[in-house]
Amino acid sequence: MTALILKRVAQAIPVMLIVAILTFLLMKLLPGDPAILIAGDGASPETVERIRVELGLDQPTVVQLGQWLWNLFHFDLGRSFLLSQPVSQAIAERLPVTISLALLAFAITIPVGIIMGVVAAYLRDSWFDTGVMSLALLGVSVPSFWLAILAVILFSVTLGWFPSAGYVPFLDSPLGWLRSLILPASILALFQIGYLARMTRSEMLEVMDQDYIRTARSKGVSEYSVLSTHAFRNALVSVLTVSGYIFSLLIGGSVVIEQIFALPGLGRLLVQAILARDLPVVQGTMLFLGFLFVAINVLVDILYTIADPRVRYD
C-alpha cells in the first residue's frame, strides 16, 4: 500500500510542474507592465527601467521561468505590489476562509446529495425522481452569482436571518462563524447537490439491475437491506471518486461566492489582484489552487484504491 501511495505522489510531481509552467506562461500573456504598475503614474522611463532590471523583467522569458521555478522550489512566490507583503503570507491569511466555506458546503452536499440520489433511484419515475433531475438541470443552467444575489435579498435584506457580508473566525465565535458562512455555503452546495444526486441515482440504478440484487430480493431480503447493504455499498465507490471532483468545484466556485458575500478568502484575493493587475498575487494564487486540485485528486485516488482493492492490481 505504501508503494502505491508513493507511486501516486510521484505521478503528481510532473503534473504540478506542468501546472507551474503553464501558470507562468499565462501570466506573461496578460497585458500590462508590472514595472509601470510599481513605479506609478508619471514615473520617468529611467525609473521604470530600473524597476524592470530589479525584477528581472529585462531577462529572456526562459531565464525568468527558470528563476521563478527556483524561487518556487524554495517556497518563494514573490511579493505583492498591492499589499506590500509576501504572496505566500497573503495566501496563508485567506486560506482558512476558503477552506471553511468549501468544507461547510461539502458537508451539506455529500449527505443531502447521496440521500436524494438513493431515494430517487428507489422511487424511479416518481415526482421525487423528476424533482431531483430538475435540480440537477438547475445546477448547470442557473448562474451562481444570480442565485447568490437573490439569496442575499431574501434571507439577509428582507428576512434578516443571516448577515449579508463579512466573516467571523471560528475561534472568535463558532456560532458567528456558522452564521457568516451558512448562506454562501448553502448556495455553493446547491449547484453540486443536484449533480451528486444524479450521479448517485445513476450508479444505484445500474447496481440495482444486477443479478445479485434480484437474487437477494428473491431470497426475501428486506428492501432496506437490499438498498443499504448491497446496492448502496457497491455504488459508493463511484460516488467517492466524484466527491473529490465536487470538492474541487466547490473551491473553484468560491471565487464568485466570496466576492458577493465579501468573504476575505482566496477567491476574493484573486479577483482583487486581477483588477489591480497584481501579477505576483494572481500567479501565486492560481498556482496554489492548481496544486490544491492536484493534491485533492491524488488523495481521492488513494482513497479509491483503499475502497476498491481491485484497482491496486490494474
Curated annotation (Swiss-Prot):
All residue ranges annotated as the ABC transmembrane type-1 domain in the record: 95-304
Protein family membership: Belongs to the binding-protein-dependent transport system permease family.
Gene Ontology molecular function: any one: dipeptide transmembrane transporter activity
Gene3D superfamilies: MetI-like
UniProt-annotated location(s): Cell inner membrane
Role played: Probably part of an ABC transporter complex that could be involved in peptide import. Probably responsible for the translocation of the substrate across the membrane.
A Pfam family the protein falls into: BPD_transp_1
A GO CC term assigned to this protein in UniProt: plasma membrane
Quaternary organization: The complex is composed of two ATP-binding proteins (BAB2_1052 and BAB2_1053), two transmembrane proteins (BAB2_1050 and BAB2_1051) and a solute-binding protein (BAB2_1049).
Protein name per UniProt: Putative peptide transport system permease protein BAB2_1050
Transmembrane segments: 12-32, 101-121, 135-155, 177-197, 237-257, 286-306
InterPro entries cross-referenced by the UniProt entry: BPD_transp_1_N (IPR045621), MetI-like (IPR000515), MetI-like_sf (IPR035906)
Protein species of origin: Brucella abortus (strain 2308)
PANTHER family in the record: DIPEPTIDE TRANSPORT SYSTEM PERMEASE PROTEIN DPPB-RELATED
Phylogenetic lineage: Bacteria, Pseudomonadati, Pseudomonadota, Alphaproteobacteria, Hyphomicrobiales
Membrane topology label: Multi-pass membrane protein
Keywords per UniProt: Cell inner membrane, Cell membrane, Membrane, Transmembrane, Transmembrane helix, Transport
